[in-house]
Amino acid sequence: MNRIDYIRNEEKKYHDLCYEQYKLFETGSWLYKPVKTVMDLMDYFEGQTNLQVLDLGSGVGRNSIPIAQKIQNTSGTVTCVDLLDSALTKLQTYSKEHDVFEVIKTEQAAIENYYIQPDTYNYIVAISSLEHVQSEEDLKNVLHSMKKGTKTGGINCLIINSNIQEIDLHTNEELDALIEINLPTEHMIYLLKSIYKEWQEIKIEIKELAYNIVRNEREIQLKTNAITFIVQK
């Protein structure tokens, strides 16, 4: 098994377990509520109809279901892309529970293999998902596709992890971070800014985050510089 397959297998185990253990919008995990920044940006589209939203790495719908609720009476659509069928199956169930099944479209694919229709979306969201493409080259290609896929006046909202460290909490040993792309923060920001150079910057922010996860019965602290990068075409 090559490195990418191994990482994706581990990620699948972690997420499958999380989606089984925790219910969407219940306290106890990161599924508890949508990302505030993602929802706040919906104000930009106030009064617009037929909004087309793309959620890359949607998971079980933490952000896409609340977005769908906001646009459900204005003939909009949220297209949700995820690698994990377990996530999309749960997303479909949750979308029925929250009465937005008609508004949500699911597509199973690795983000780097997903074809983004040009000039189609008003709002593209990618939360902690772009660092899971296979290579830096793939990341650049996806970002260019996102740009092409955005309508004039549309917004891209990315939260992308950089400079990720994993530390075994029992031994204090630094482990090889199980992430496909782990770029230094400055490098990642430079890459994003250079690709989106002709777009209007709405917000760029770096937050140091640390949280504990369990992987293969090991308690691990995950440290990351999470970059929020929001731009308008």
Where are these regions (language model features)?
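A structural alpha-helix within SAM-dependent methyltransferase catalytic domains
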Residues: 65-68, 143-147
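A short, conserved alpha-helix within the catalytic core of class I
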Residues: 133-145
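A conserved beta-strand element that flanks and buttresses the S-adenosyl-L-methionine
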Residues: 125
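Class I (Rossmann-like) S-adenosyl-L-methionine-dependent methyltransferase catalytic domain
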Residues: 1-52, 59-115, 156-233
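Short catalytic micro-motifs in class I SAM-dependent methyltransferases
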Residues: 128-132
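Short glycine-dipeptide loop
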Residues: 150-155
